[in-house]
Amino acid sequence: MNKFLVFFIIFVINTCYANNFSAEYKVSTTGIKIGNFSWSLNINDNIYQTEINLKNSGIFSPLYKFEGSYLSTGVIENNIFKTQNYKQFWKTKKKTKIVKMSFDDYLIELKQEPIEEEIARVDLEDLYLYFDPITSFINILNGEN
């Protein structure tokens, strides 16, 4: 009976509010594999972390190398995923791009390496409840605007 109670407390109660999802895909164009795509979403007590990873693979790997990772963490309030931190890394033969963003209900901080030369068409600091691309996609899939 004690073993059952310990098992129940550790494995059942502890994970009642946890959800982990992951998926892996092969990326192809006209039937030719060019890369791998993986996506994970972990939810625990209204806190989430989602990560996407991309990497070249297949016959064209020597010609077009790329890799990227996207990490978003935040909270879930009223069934809406709200970003707190976002990191993006993208690397090709020609360049490496790193983006870091922090949020409350507004964008608090945006860092880009190298610094973006192009002038922004939208003032991101004025957007209310603006989220990173991954979290926005999750909210759409979740039926939220």
Question: What do these predicted ranges mean?
Answer:
Residues F4-N14:
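Sec-dependent N-terminal signal peptides
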Residues V6, N20, F81, N85, ...:
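Alpha-helical structural elements
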Residues C16-I80, N85-I98:
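N-terminal cleavable signal peptides for secretion/export
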